[in-house]
C-alpha cells in the first residue's frame, strides 16, 4: 500500500510518499502545468491513499483522484498545522506532517465533504449572494445621487415611480450619463437576481428537507436551501453547541482559573449561512411568539447586535433539529421548548448548553 502526504498549492504540490511493504520513502515536487500530476498518480500500483489539507483550489485534484480510483482524505488545516511542533516550515515538511498523520492510526483530522450535488447548490447560493451584494452597493450609490439632489424617497426609490423620479432629475451631462448607466445596470441586476431566486425556490421545493424548513415562520427558500446544503448530514452534530461552533456563532474564550472571559464571535464557520440566519431572524422574530419574546429579552439585556446574534443562533438550532428529526414547524412546536441540559424528550438527545466542542467539518 502506498500512502501519500500532499501539500497542495495552486501551481504545484509537494509530496511525501511511503510504500508500506518496502518502507521506501519518496519525496517529490510536481508542477500542475501539463500532465505531470495525472501521469504520476496513474503510475502508482496497488492500493493508494492520498491525504491533503482543505484548500479553496482542491476541487480539480479531488476529481482527478476520483477518476483514477484513488482514495483521498481531506484534513482540517488548523488541526494539521497544530500537529507540527518544529519551527521550520516549508512545503516538503508540510507534506511530511500530513504523511505522518496518515501513517499514525486515527491521527489524521478528516473533515466532512459535501457531495457533488451539494457543492453545485452551494455555488448557486454563493452566486446569488454575490449579485445581491453588487445590487446593494449600486443602491447605495444611486441613493447618494438622489439625496444630493433633494430626492428623498428611501426604499420607495426602487419602485417604478421612484426610478422614474430619479430618471427625471435634471443633472449635468456627466452626472446624467452616470445616473443612466447605473440605473440600467440596476435593472440588469434585478433581472438576474430574480432568475436566481426562481432557481433557488425550485430547488427548495423539490427537496423534502428544505420544504420542512420552509414551514418555519420567517424562513424563505434561500435560507432553507442554504441550511440543508451547508449543514449537510445533521446527524454528524451531537449537540446544538456543535452546530453553533461549526457556523462560527460561539464566542472566543480566554479563561483561566475561576475567571471567565468571553470575546467576540469566532466567525470560523460558513459566513453565508451565518448571514442568512441573522437576516431570517428579523422576520422570524416577528412571526414566532417564542422567538419574539427571546429576542426582546436579549434586546433589553444585551443590546441590538448581541440580541440578533443570539436569536439567529436559536433559529439556526431550531432548523438543525427540524432537519435531524425530519419534522416540520408544527411538530416542533408540539414537542414544546428545547430540552434543558441533562433532560431529553423521547427519541431526542439532550440539549447540551455547556461549552462548545470543536466540530470536524467542511471548510467550504
Model-derived regions, located:
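A detector of single, family-specific signature residues
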Residues: 1-364
Amino acid at each position: 500500500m502506498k500512502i501519500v502526504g500532499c501539500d497542495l498549492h495552486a501551481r504545484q504540490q509537494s509530496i511525501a510518499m511511503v510504500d508500506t511493504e518496502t518502507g521506501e520513502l519518496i519525496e517529490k515536487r510536481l508542477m500542475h502545468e501539463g500532465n505531470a500530476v495525472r501521469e504520476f498518480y496513474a503510475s502508482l500500483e496497488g492500493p493508494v491513499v492520498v491525504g491533503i489539507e482543505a484548500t479553496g483550489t482542491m476541487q480539480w485534484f479531488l476529481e482527478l483522484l476520483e477518476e483514477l480510483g484513488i482514495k483521498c482524505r481531506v484534513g482540517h488545516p488548523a488541526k494539521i498545522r497544530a500537529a507540527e511542533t518544529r519551527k521550520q516550515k516549508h512545503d516538503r515538511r508540510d507534506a511530511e506532517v500530513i504523511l505522518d498523520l496518515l501513517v499514525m492510526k486515527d491521527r489524521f483530522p478528516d473533515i466532512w465533504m459535501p457531495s457533488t450535488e451539494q457543492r453545485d447548490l452551494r455555488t448557486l447560493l454563493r452566486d446569488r449572494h454575490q449579485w445581491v451584494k453588487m445590487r446593494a452597493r449600486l443602491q447605495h450609490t444611486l441613493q447618494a445621487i438622489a439625496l444630493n439632489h433633494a430626492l428623498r424617497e428611501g426604499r420607495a426609490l426602487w419602485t417604478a415611480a421612484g426610478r422614474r423620479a430619479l430618471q427625471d432629475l435634471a443633472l449635468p451631462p456627466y452626472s446624467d450619463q452616470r445616473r443612466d448607466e447605473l440605473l440600467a445596470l440596476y435593472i440588469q441586476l434585478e433581472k438576474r437576481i430574480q432568475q436566481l431566486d426562481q432557481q433557488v425556490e425550485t430547488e427548495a421545493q423539490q427537496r423534502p428537507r428544505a420544504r420542512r424548513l420552509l414551514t418555519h415562520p420567517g424562513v424563505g427558500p434561500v435560507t432553507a436551501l442554504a441550511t440543508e446544503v451547508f449543514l449537510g448530514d445533521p446527524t454528524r452534530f451531537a449537540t446544538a453547541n456543535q452546530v453553533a461552533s461549526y457556523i462560527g456563532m460561539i464566542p472566543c474564550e480566554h479563561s483561566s482559573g475561576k475567571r471567565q472571559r468571553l470575546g467576540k464571535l469566532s466567525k470560523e464557520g460558513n459566513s453565508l449561512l451565518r448571514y442568512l440566519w441573522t437576516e431570517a431572524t428579523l422576520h422570524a422574530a416577528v412571526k414566532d411568539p417564542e422567538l419574539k419574546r427571546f429576542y426582546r429579552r436579549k434586546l433589553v439585556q444585551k443590546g441590538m447586535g448581541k440580541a440578533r446574534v443570539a436569536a439567529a443562533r436559536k433559529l439556526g438550532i431550531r432548523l438543525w433539529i427540524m432537519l435531524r428529526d425530519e419534522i416540520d414547524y408544527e411538530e416542533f412546536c408540539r414537542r414544546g421548548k428545547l430540552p434543558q441540559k441533562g433532560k431529553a424528550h423521547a427519541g431526542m438527545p439532550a440539549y447540551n448548553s455547556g461549552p462548545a466542542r470543536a466540530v470536524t467539518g467542511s471548510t467550504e
